[in-house]
Amino acid sequence: ITPRLDTHGEVNLILTNGSHLTAEWGIDVKVGDTFTVYAQSTDEGTMGRLTACLPADFNLDRMVHYSVWPDSGMAGIGSSARWRAGNDGIRESEGTIIINGGNIRAKGQDNASAIGGTRAEEIEFRSTDRGKIYNRRQGGSITINGGVVRTEPFALPEGNPLAVISVGIGTCHYGYGGSVTINGGTVIA
């Protein structure tokens, strides 16, 4: 078990007035899953809050053992990269995220969206007798109907010459397809 919240099927989260849920390692929403957020009210001063802001470093030395290890490139809310026993890895296609209300703050890691998915072209790589097969990673659907949504892409310390490939909302670099629809609310990305 990992500290990352993992959705299975349809998950509805209702943020009651004055509540604050912090998902320190984010919320995983992979293909086939739908994560919908509601708020009890529309008053910014009282509506519930959801924070899914990932740390820049998170036990990279793997001193704590997990059966399914979240890897770098995790979205604050969305799909991620995971490694199972040894070096067997998978980068997930994205699911469906619907935000109807609430005060939402999200930040992904380097190579991931704050709300969306991981940076990768293929889900997994394997070789066969006939050559290489790539299973293309698909973008998901993100709809914002209300609430206050604040995202920030991962940023390296000032002066670091490395490029950062992250976005606030949407499919991250190399993902195929996907959509972002904003029907209402306040969005700062």
Please describe what each predicted stretch is.
Residues 1-189:
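A composition-driven surface/loop motif
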